[in-house]
UniProtKB/Swiss-Prot annotation:
Matches recorded under InterPro entries: Pantoate_hydroxy_MeTrfase (IPR003700), Pyrv/PenolPyrv_kinase-like_dom (IPR015813), Pyrv_kinase-like_dom_sf (IPR040442)
Subcellular location: Cytoplasm
Biological role stated in the UniProt entry: Catalyzes the reversible reaction in which hydroxymethyl group from 5,10-methylenetetrahydrofolate is transferred onto alpha-ketoisovalerate to form ketopantoate.
Listed GO MF terms: 3-methyl-2-oxobutanoate hydroxymethyltransferase activity; magnesium ion binding
Pfam families per the UniProt record, alphabetical: Pantoate_transf
Organism name: Vesicomyosocius okutanii subsp. Calyptogena okutanii (strain HA)
GO biological process annotation, one example: pantothenate biosynthetic process
Gene: panB
Protein name, UniProt field: 3-methyl-2-oxobutanoate hydroxymethyltransferase
Keywords, sorted A to Z: Cytoplasm, Magnesium, Metal-binding, Pantothenate biosynthesis, Transferase
C-alpha cells in the first residue's frame, strides 16, 4: 500500500481500512488480512500503559512500538503518531519526525490545524509524508475538558473545514477526522481531494479507523459510541479483522448507531 493508492481509493469510492497496532504480532495478523493502513497510535498510552489520556506517551515509546510494528508489516502503509509536545516548533518537529521514519514509519501524524503551520510546512519541505488529525484531538482533552463531539456548532464546523483545506494546501496526504457529526465529515471529505479517514465521523468519510483493542472488545476505558466489537460474532482475531475490513469496504460500517 502507498499514498498514491489511497488517492485512487478516494477517487474510485473504495473505502480505506485502518487499525492501530503496537507490536509485531498484531501487526502481522492485520497485515495478512489485508488492512490498508496500520497506525502506531499514541493511544498506546490508554490501551498499553493504562493511562487516562495520551499525554505521557514519549518519543521513546513511539519509536519502540514503531520498530516492533515495522517488523510485522510487509504490505500495509505504516503511520506513526507524533506524541504530545513533540512538534511544538518546526525544527523539533522535523527532528522527531525523522526519528519515527528511521524507526519504520512511512508517514507521521500530527494533531491540530493552522496553529501548527510551520511544522506541517517543514515536513513537506523535507519530503516527509504527513497525516493530519482534526475534530476531537486526544492530546487536547485537558484543554477541551474531556472527550466530546466536535464541530456541532457552526463556528466549530467552519473551523474544522478551514483547517482541512489548509492542511491539504500544505501537502498533507491524509486526514484523520475524529468524533464529529456525520454531515460535517461528509462536507470535509467533499471539500478536499485527499482522503479523510473517520473515527466516529460517519459513513461518508473515505475510510475508517478504530483502535484495535476497542474493535476486539479489550476495553480498559469508557467505550465510545462509535466503537463496534467485531470479535463478538467472530471466533478469533483474524476473523474479526476480516469482518471489520469487509464492513468498511461494503459500507455497512459505521451505521447510524455508531455515528453522531
Amino acid at each position: 500500500m502507498n499514498i498514491e493508492a489511497l488517492k485512487v481509493f478516494k477517487e474510485s469510492g473504495e473505502k480505506i481500512t485502518c487499525l492501530t497496532a503496537y507490536d509485531a504480532s498484531f501487526a502481522s495478523v492485520f497485515d495478512a488480512c489485508g488492512i490498508d493502513i496500520i497506525l502506531v497510535g499514541d493511544s498506546l498510552g490508554n490501551v498499553i500503559q493504562g493511562d487516562k489520556n495520551t499525554l505521557d506517551v514519549s518519543m521513546s515509546d513511539m519509536i519502540y512500538h514503531m520498530q516492533a510494528v515495522a517488523k510485522g508489516t510487509q504490505n500495509a502503509l505504516r503511520i506513526a503518531d507524533m506524541p504530545y509536545q513533540s512538534y511544538t516548533y518546526a525544527e523539533q518537529t522535523l527532528t522527531n519526525a525523522k526519528r519515527l521514519i528511521m524507526a519504520g514509519a512511512q508517514m507521521v501524524k500530527l494533531e491540530g490545524g493552522c496553529e501548527h503551520e510551520a511544522s506541517f510546512r517543514i515536513l513537506q519541505g523535507n519530503d516527509i509524508s504527513v497525516c493530519g488529525h482534526l475534530g476531537l484531538q486526544p492530546q487536547s482533552v485537558v484543554e477541551i475538558d474531556g472527550y466530546r463531539v466536535q464541530g456541532r456548532g457552526k463556528q466549530g464546523a467552519n473551523k474544522i473545514i478551514k483547517n482541512a483545506l489548509a492542511l491539504a494546501s500544505w501537502g498533507v496526504k491524509v486526514i484523520v477526522l475524529e468524533c464529529v457529526p456525520a454531515e460535517l465529515a461528509k462536507q470535509v471529505s467533499q471539500s478536499v481531494s485527499i482522503p479523510i479517514i473517520g473515527i466516529g465521523a460517519g459513513l461518508d468519510c473515505d475510510g475508517q479507523v478504530l483502535v484495535s483493542y476497542d474493535m476486539l472488545g479489550v476495553h480498559v476505558r469508557h467505550v465510545p459510541r462509535f466503537v463496534k466489537n467485531f470479535l463478538t460474532d467472530n471466533g478469533d482475531v483474524k476473523s474479526a479483522v476480516n469482518a471489520f475490513i469487509k464492513a468498511v469496504k461494503d459500507k455497512s460500517f459505521p451505521s447510524k448507531k455508531y455515528s453522531y
